[in-house]
Curated annotation (Swiss-Prot):
The lineage of its organism: Bacteria, Pseudomonadati, Pseudomonadota, Gammaproteobacteria, Pseudomonadales. It comes from the Bacteria. Signal peptide: none annotated. This is Succinyl-diaminopimelate desuccinylase. Its EC number is 3.5.1.18. Zn(2+) 1 binds at H73, D107, E170. The gene is dapE. One of its GO terms (biological process) is L-arginine biosynthetic process. Homodimer.
Length: 383
């Protein structure tokens, strides 16, 4: 284990944050540590406690000029069985292989530390930089995400705040730091479908209407449907049934109702309204007695090549020597809320191989490189 005195400022802060057990939506004073450091170099701080969620908004610089925002979350997922970890989940140690171990090392306290240290250095080196450096941090990303970034964005919109560019510190890298940046995400549209039949005895099927039998052809058609072709940035829209429930538990009873949960991960080639209309048409075609509850988790967003993506890619190349690959794969992130402000959004963070797993870990030296990438991006855009 590396002694604390030997650690860089980024690693010292990362370890301090990891040692705080901030299981969602608890912040465990992680944001206080970040705000203390940012405030010390002249950031204006605005804590935003919304329901049971801690958030903060911080800015440095002038209203005139572009705004570059760092976004992220201090909350982490539960550890799972602690006895399965090689080290205590919140111990934050660097092992003999140079790996920083602990819950949140990759997702995403390492990124938070890199953002803070890079921004400290930037505003000290360029005190009269153009535009603004901003932070939007929440403790509600791994949970319901109702009172975190989404709610803060609504407040920022209400007072006409502008965000030109945003770097979300999600662990985007796959094998090597910076090999992948996320320049967009698919939308997520979920639904609970209820199909009604008529309960009865299995020996008298003519007196019952089995909703499983009735719904099966419609569900099969939905699963086989080709929703769109995708495009240069997104794969085709996908449809997946995640849960099917029906029956009383008895083998001699025809159930009276079936429920199905399904989800679309959809590209910019499809719309919410279009997907809903096509689902309705298929269900009606099969003459079902049905109802549906829709839940939109987020719309798709895309940052095409331009100032932000170019600056990030150039910084990665300059620091690591490697070319990055923009990607829109994976699940949703808080970037979907920030993109509604008309903001160019990219996600850049550590290697994601162990996120949410037992023994979450990243190469400790990657965090100093990530700090330099963030710093160089700031210089390219705001110096």
């Amino acid at each position: 284990m590396t002694a604390p005195a030997e650690l860089s400022p980024t690693l010292q802060l990362a370890c301090d944050l990891i040692r705080r057990p901030s299981v969602t939506p608890v912040d465990a004073d992680c944001q206080a540590q970040m705000m203390n450091r940012l405030g010390a170099v002249g950031f204006e701080l605005e804590p935003m406690r919304i329901e049971d969620v801690d958030n903060f908004w911080a800015t440095h610089g002038s209203q005139d000029g572009p705004v570059l925002c760092f976004a992220g979350h201090t909350d982490v997922v539960p550890t799972g069985p602690v006895q399965q970890w090689q080290h205590e989940p919140f111990e934050a140690l660097i092992d003999a292989d140079g790996m920083l171990c602990g819950r949140g090392a990759a997702d995403m306290k390492g990124s938070l530390a890199s953002m803070v240290i890079a921004s400290e250095r930037f505003v000290q080196d360029y005190p009269n930089h153009r535009g603004k450096v901003a932070f939007l941090i929440t403790s509600d990303e791994e949970g319901p995400a109702h009172h975190g970034t989404k709610a803060v964005v609504e407040r920022l919109k209400a007072r006409n705040e502008r965000l030109d560019w945003c770097i979300v510190g999600e662990p985007s890298s796959t094998t090597l730091l910076g090999d992948v940046v996320k320049n967009g995400r698919r939308g997520s549209l979920g639904a609970k479908l209820t199909v009604r039949g008529k309960q009865g005895h299995v020996a008298y099927p003519h007196l019952a209407r089995n909703p499983i039998h009735l719904a099966a052809p419609a569900l099969a058609e939905l699963a086989a449907e080709h929703w769109d072709e995708g495009n240069a940035f997104f794969p085709p829209t996908s449809f997946q049934i995640s849960n099917l429930n029906s029956g009383t538990g008895a083998t001699n009873v025809v159930p009276g109702e079936l429920t199905a949960l399904f989800n679309f991960r959809f590209s910019t080639e499809s719309t919410v309204e279009g997907l809903q209309a096509r689902v309705s048409a298929i269900l009606d075609k099969h003459e079902l007695d049905w109802s549906i509850d829709w839940a939109l988790s987020g719309l798709p967003f895309l940052t095409e090549p331009g100032e932000l993506l170019d600056a990030v890619a150039s910084s990665i190349k300059g620091v690591t020597g490697r070319d990055t690959q923009p990607s829109t794969s994976g699940g949703t992130s808080d970037g979907r809320f920030i993109a509604t402000m008309g903001t160019q959004v990219v996600e850049l963070g550590p290697v994601n191989a162990t996120i949410h797993q037992v023994d979450e870990r990243i190469l400790a030296s990657d965090l100093d490189l990530l700090t330099e990438i963030y710093y160089q991006t700031l210089v390219r855009l705001l110096a």
